[in-house]
Amino acid sequence: MSGQTTSEYIGHHLQFLKTGDSFWNVHIDTLFFSVLAAIIFLAVFRSVAKKATSGVPGKLQCMVEILVEWINGIVKENFHGPRNVVAPLALTIFCWVFIMNAIDLIPVDFLPQLAGLFGIHYLRAVPTADISATLGMSLCVFALILFYTVKSKGFGGLVKEYTLHPFNHWSLIPVNFVLESVTLLAKPISLAFRLFGNMYAGELIFILIAVMYSANAAIAALGIPLHLAWAIFHILIVTLQAFIFMMLTVVYLSIAYNKAEH
């Protein structure tokens, strides 16, 4: 933080590495760490799959098996349809979002300073603290909601659902369409902003605690236990937000798939 005011330090840490300043710019750091998190997930599961044994499993294999069985049980309980796509999707979402969230536990100055050695002056390492990333994932869930609705009811059923519900009269079709559209759009929007809001707030608190280290000795000493306490608590937030995103995805897809039965 040398040579920077507090506001400059905070502002610097909230700047993305991007391709330009227009609305359509690409956040390179978000893409990089999202892909890195996906590679870590695939590498771990591929390694476990290759070394899987029917004998006494290792610690990592045991942990992965427990995780897979746990998520498969959640999907089985909540999604009453073919699970060959939804169960792997739920596992991928939970692990991917968890890894992206967990990057927030790395000290806030470590990765930006490391990037600075390569001439990169701005870097935000937590993809889920970027609304463009969480909204992108939520739009994919939105597309799957529409897909499973059409799959269970057909395109005609989809049209009827958004024109003749909740008021089954032709004169109220515009009202029905507005009400159902708002309900539908609220799902991906709330999904995106819930994850983004929690992770952005967590990142900002870590930055504010880091600011304390540049103050006098008494405040800097206070920052150490605060940092440790928040990091421990943040482990819960990291895990919980990954679970909530995964769980709501399964629930939304279940509602879309089973609407034909209601």
From Swiss-Prot:
Keyword Transmembrane helix in record: yes
Pfam family, one: ATP-synt_A
Recorded GO CC terms: plasma membrane; proton-transporting ATP synthase complex
Entry membrane topology: Multi-pass membrane protein
GO biological processes: proton motive force-driven plasma membrane ATP synthesis
Keywords noted in UniProt: ATP synthesis, Cell inner membrane, Cell membrane, CF(0), Hydrogen ion transport, Ion transport, Membrane, Transmembrane, Transmembrane helix, Transport
Xref: NCBIfam families: ATP_synt_6_or_A, PRK05815.1-1
Record-given protein name: ATP synthase subunit a
Species whose genome carries this gene: Mannheimia succiniciproducens (strain KCTC 0769BP / MBEL55E)
